[in-house]
């Protein structure tokens, strides 16, 4: 029976999901398919690389570090994002709290991330490259409007996947999963409301406003 796991995003709330994944690792349980959105998959790759507590270590050591996140990063012309992209997706995994690329590459299953195509407003699903030491796709799936630039993924303008498909369980079923574990970062009763900032989104992204009738998830 093919088993998949779906990891919802949610910025720092996603540390809950990493606890679930770490618990699965204690039983040496890895599914055949992993898909996530935004911070869900950004943290989820450490589950696939079998690095228990890695995400917790990052959170404890760097969550209050201005290099990690802060408006100062957004004002830098070489960054243009609330998160310090080079620090988060380069320095941390390659120097400070090393990511195990070899174990990640050896995983025999599928790993996908969700992004929102800014031309269509629809979700796109891409495999996470096993040897990308810049994690470009993970940067794109975390790219909230206003707080990140638009990322080019295979010639398509992409941003945060949670805008188009926040809980991609249907994608897991499409990929042949017969059993799907869904890890949420909101309470069971949570219902996402219409986005109050939609007029600002339309103004900020005028070229996409016809197609991009989306609800940006509240973080």
Feature-to-residue mapping (PLM):
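Patatin-like phospholipase
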Residues: 1-37, 45-219
């Amino acid at each position: 029976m093919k088993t998949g796991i779906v990891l919802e995003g949610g910025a720092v709330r996603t540390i809950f999901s990493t606890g679930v994944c770490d618990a699965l690792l204690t039983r040496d349980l890895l599914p055949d398919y992993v898909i996530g959105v935004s911070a869900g998959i950004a943290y989820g790759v450490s589950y696939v690389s079998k690095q228990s507590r890695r995400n917790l270590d990052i959170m404890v050591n760097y969550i209050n570090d201005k290099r990690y996140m802060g408006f100062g990063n957004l004002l830098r012309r070489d960054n243009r994002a609330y998160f310090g992209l080079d620090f988060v997706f380069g320095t941390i995994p390659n120097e400070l709290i090393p990511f195990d690329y070899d174990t990640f590459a050896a995983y025999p299953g599928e790993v996908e991330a969700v992004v929102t195509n800014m031309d269509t407003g629809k979700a796109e699903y891409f495999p996470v490259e096993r040897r990308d030491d810049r994690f470009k796709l993970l940067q794109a799936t975390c790219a909230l409007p206003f707080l990140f630039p638009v990322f080019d993924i295979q010639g398509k303008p992409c941003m945060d996947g949670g805008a188009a498909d926040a809980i991609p369980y249907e994608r897991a079923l499409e990929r042949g999963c017969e059993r799907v574990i869904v890890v949420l970062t909101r309470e069971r009763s949570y219902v996402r409301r219409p986005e109050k900032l939609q007029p600002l989104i339309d103004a900020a992204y005028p070229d996409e406003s016809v197609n991009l009738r989306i609800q940006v998830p509240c973080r």
